[in-house]
From Swiss-Prot:
Pfam families noted in UniProt: YbeY (PF02130)
Organism: Pseudarthrobacter chlorophenolicus (strain ATCC 700700 / DSM 12829 / CIP 107037 / JCM 12360 / KCTC 9906 / NCIMB 13794 / A6)
GO BP: rRNA processing
Predominant place of localization: cytoplasm
Protein name listed in UniProt: Endoribonuclease YbeY
Function: Single strand-specific metallo-endoribonuclease involved in late-stage 70S ribosome quality control and in maturation of the 3' terminus of the 16S rRNA.
EC number(s) on file: 3.1.-.-
Database matches in Gene3D superfamilies: Metalloproteases ('zincins'), catalytic domain
Amino acid sequence: MSIEVNNESGVEVDEAGLVALSRYIFEQLYIHPQAELSILLVDEPAMEKLHIELMDEPGATDVLSVPMDDLTPGTPDRPTPQGMLGDIAICPQVAQVQAKNAGHALQDEMLLLTTHGILHLLGYDHAEPEEKEEMFGLQRELLTGFTGKEAPAETTQ
């Protein structure tokens, strides 16, 4: 699997941890081993620009997902086909504020946002209460399994 992290944010982030988490999620959700994912870490002005371009909403946000191929979680007998999962843009500056407000470390927030972004790439959403329950439940399960501790509270905007 190809997972690339490009840090243009100016904030020091444990990029290896984000890659390890992504690999864990790919394995848990039976994503094809040749699937590709790009994680871009950007500063607030760059995130605001992306937020306007992609969502037509002003202001920086925490995470944006841009799916490429229409991939969904697989099963043990039928993994996801090979393809480009997509791109995730994360703003560590916004994540720092959210982590502080939630009372957990920046790395915990970065792991939360990475998981959240990957789930969006796989078609999960949280617009409706049932969708939110399913997505956030899976998000907590994946984070707890990866870190071995209780997942941080959801802080996504």
